[in-house]
């Protein structure tokens, strides 16, 4: 039954994505924020499909920790689920992502129209410059910025190296950092066709001020907040 539900999901996902890709292309001449709203509706629609077809939904801890002003969301990255659900949880945001994603047929063209901050991970020095330059432009337009500080998807129970890019951007743009833990990998395994029913937890931690300590101390604080919450929400699922 799970396989059948996943097949149905992927069929509906494809139709849903094709429709919104056409809409997004037609909206290419519109201002960035209007184009972005189209992508947000698409993302929320996919989250709805996952809930209704697969039985995969989410809950939020720490909703009161979301600031009133645009900030930098530093989120654990375990699956594609958070790239969708975060758009329903936080205000209009752009993602920091690797530029190679632009080369994916259809999906890549849609990404470009969503005004992300694209970086070249093979050239760290250049990537930092790109984050700061493009980040300022997005901030000036009122966007929040979402970044995955470990730079890639991490399996549940594991931890990657936290890079300084988010803290450097926060310091340069004077934007606070909002650490977020998420256990989506327990229900949407890396490189898996199957998604599993359950409740993903997003644990939003108290913000880190952009002028807190040094850049290294900011990132250490972010890592500590995420990993502490991460252990709790993953353990909670295992104990069910």
How does the language model describe each region?
Residues 129-240:
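Non-catalytic C-terminal accessory region of glycerolipid acyltransferases
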Residues 17, 21-40, 51-53, 68-124:
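Catalytic core of membrane glycerolipid acyltransferases/transacylases, capturing the structured
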Residues 61, 97-98, 119-121, 149, ...:
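Thr-Gly-centered strand-to-loop micro-motif
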Residues 52-61, 128-129, 183-186:
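Short gly/ser/thr-rich secondary-structure transition/capping motifs
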Residues 60, 73, 95-96, 202-204:
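Generic preference for hydrophobic
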Residues 1-28, 64, 137, 217-240:
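Membrane-interfacial terminal anchoring regions of lipid-handling membrane enzymes
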């Amino acid at each position: 039954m799970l396989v059948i539900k996943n097949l149905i999901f992927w069929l509906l996902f494809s139709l849903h994505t094709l429709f919104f890709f056409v809409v997004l292309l037609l909206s290419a001449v519109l201002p960035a924020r209007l184009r972005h709203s189209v992508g947000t509706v698409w993302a929320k629609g996919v989250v709805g499909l996952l809930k209704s077809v697969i039985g995969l939904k989410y809950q939020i801890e720490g909703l009161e920790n979301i600031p009133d002003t645009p900030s930098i969301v530093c989120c654990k990255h375990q699956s594609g689920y958070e790239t969708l659900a975060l758009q329903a949880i936080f205000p209009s945001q752009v993602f920091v992502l690797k530029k190679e994603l632009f080369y994916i047929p259809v999906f890549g063209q849609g990404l470009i129209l969503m005004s992300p901050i694209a970086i070249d991970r093979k050239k760290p020095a250049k990537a930092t410059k790109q984050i700061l330059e493009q980040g300022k432009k997005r901030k000036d337009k009122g966007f929040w910025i979402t970044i995955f500080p470990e730079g890639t998807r991490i399996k549940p129970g594991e931890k990657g190296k936290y890079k300084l890019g988010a803290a450097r951007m926060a310091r340069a743009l004077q934007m606070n950092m909002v650490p977020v833990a998420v256990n989506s990998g327990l229900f949407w395994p890396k490189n898996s066709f199957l998604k599993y029913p359950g409740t993903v937890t997003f644990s939003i931690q108290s913000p880190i001020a952009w002028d807190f300590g040094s850049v290294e101390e900011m990132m250490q604080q972010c890592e500590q907040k995420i990993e502490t919450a991460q252990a709790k929400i993953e353990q909670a699922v295992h104990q069910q």
